[in-house]
Amino acid sequence: MRGKTQEDRDLIEMLDPVAESLGYEIVRLRLMGGTEQRRLQIMAEHPLLEDGSGGDMNVEDCAKLSRAVSEVLDAADPIAGEYTLEVSSPGIDRPLTRLKDFDDYAGLEARIELDRVAEGRKRFKGELAGVEDDQVGLNIEGEDDVTVYFPFAWVIDAKLVMTDALMERGAKQRAARLESDNEDLSESEED
């Protein structure tokens, strides 16, 4: 789900090491548009850490990753024709594109769409219940104590739902990130 097309997946394979070398993870990559007005959209973030920090990117992070990605793309020239590069944070109501996302955000509300009918439907909304093997767990909204599991391979779209709990978690992540950034700044001033 990080890339929809083979071209997207090839670009992810090329650019993952670039992002990782800078301390970021590519959440999603999409090369959109036809032969004209193409746009390469990359969503990235800092990895989530045990202390709750990470997960977001600021403008400086986006610019840093954009410059590094541009250098690699200019050298390899894997995209035919002109295109615009956009690097951004996935945002608070982010897409869930990797199996680990369903574990990292367990306990939060999400919308999930499958590529096939399961439990009589393709679309679900509920609280993420984590991961078991390659199965994504969801406590279905409106159902009493019903948790269903779907193979991750069936998921074609998934996104967190904006809730108070999500806003609170986002605020905690930003606070932890600011604290970490301030510690890094203090250490560099001491040097």
From Swiss-Prot:
InterPro entries, alphabetized: Ribosome_maturation_RimP, RimP_C, RimP_C_sf, RimP_N, RimP_N_sf
Keyword Mitochondrion: no
Source superkingdom: Bacteria
SUPFAM superfamilies: YhbC-like, C-terminal domain, YhbC-like, N-terminal domain
Signal peptide span: none
CDD domains reported for this sequence: YlxS_C
Keywords: Cytoplasm, Ribosome biogenesis
S-S pairs: none
Chief localization: cytoplasm
GO biological process: ribosomal small subunit assembly; translation
Ligase found in the keyword field: no
Gene Ontology CC terms, in alphabetical order: cytosol
Localisation per UniProt entry: Cytoplasm
Known function: Required for maturation of 30S ribosomal subunits.
Family as reported in the entry's similarity comment: Belongs to the RimP family.
Protein name (database record): Ribosome maturation factor RimP
Species per Swiss-Prot/TrEMBL record: Caulobacter vibrioides (strain NA1000 / CB15N)
